[in-house]
Amino acid sequence: MRYLRPLMQAGPARPRDAVALGWCWFTHVEVLSRTEPAQVIPAKDLTPEELARFGDPGTAPQLMGILNTTPDSFSDGGSFDTLERAVAQGQALVAAGADILDIGGESTRPGASLVPEDVEISRTAPVIAALRGAGVDVAISIDTRKAAVAKAALEAGASIVNDVSGFTFDADLAPLCAARGVPVCVMHAQGEPQSMQKNPQYNNVLLDVFDALHERVEALIASGIPREKITADPGIGFGKTQDHNLAILNRISLFHGLGVPILLGASRKRFIGSIGNAPNAQDRAPGSVAVALAAIAQGVAIIRAHDVAEHAQAIALWRASVAHPFA
């Protein structure tokens, strides 16, 4: 099998034969293989079927604001674990520019323990209902691996299900989402949170993650969820070393070949602190923004972020200075 990575560009100097993909375009693709050296070929040499594989990221990148209602999340655990503080933070994220709120009641940081369903529901459903009651009308995503939690969240007003297990943890979750007709995000993770960072191994991390996500996307489609309702996340930091993370980020446009939009969740992750000399997670906004802009330049559709205001400002300036004709 050959893997096709569009070499994304943005800006006004677009050749006539360029292939448009969201706010970006490309004239060449990098052909990757498990057995042959990588090579770059013109996009015009692709078959119509190969060109049709690439997912459209939409007209503009979106920001997903992170709202953890947990006592133990890696960067903000305990900050928003009361209803009042969680609602206030959700409103603040929307005011700062969040297009989506992603609400989670179970930490999936390395080493985290499983949270019982009833506890997770008590941490999330009331917050979602209160946000809707307060007039928050942006899309709300429930970050969960469990069907019962997702069901309660959807009934409270959520409209997206984001599963870090890739819909492998709970067999009832995909059928629930199919029956409700809601969009989903499927993420790649190797192993369980308790042990996923203990010496993760891959043959080729980029292609292994692509293949795993391709299998999950096709499984979700087979379960009744339309392709146009699926977003894929390569799962930065979930069973991956720093080198694994960087290999994915360097060639993240490969994941357009899944035929769905790409979501990136790298905000405040440990590798940003390591490279950027920021041991405190709250000090990693500049590095998080840098990673986000690099991803947007490769056509990533959704950026999941803690520091929404900083990301919103940076993205606005990136679009104005680099991709203005398409803004």
Pin down the residues of each PLM region.
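Short acidic capping loops at alpha-helix termini that bridge into adjacent secondary structure
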Residues: 138, 226-229
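Catalytic domains of carbohydrate-active enzymes, especially glycoside hydrolases
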Residues: 88-104, 298
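Active-site-adjacent loop and "lid" segments of alpha/beta metabolic enzymes
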Residues: 1-22, 74-89, 108-133, 139-148, ...
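N-terminal accessory interaction module
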Residues: 1-57
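Polyampholytic, low-complexity intrinsically disordered segments
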Residues: 49-53, 70, 185
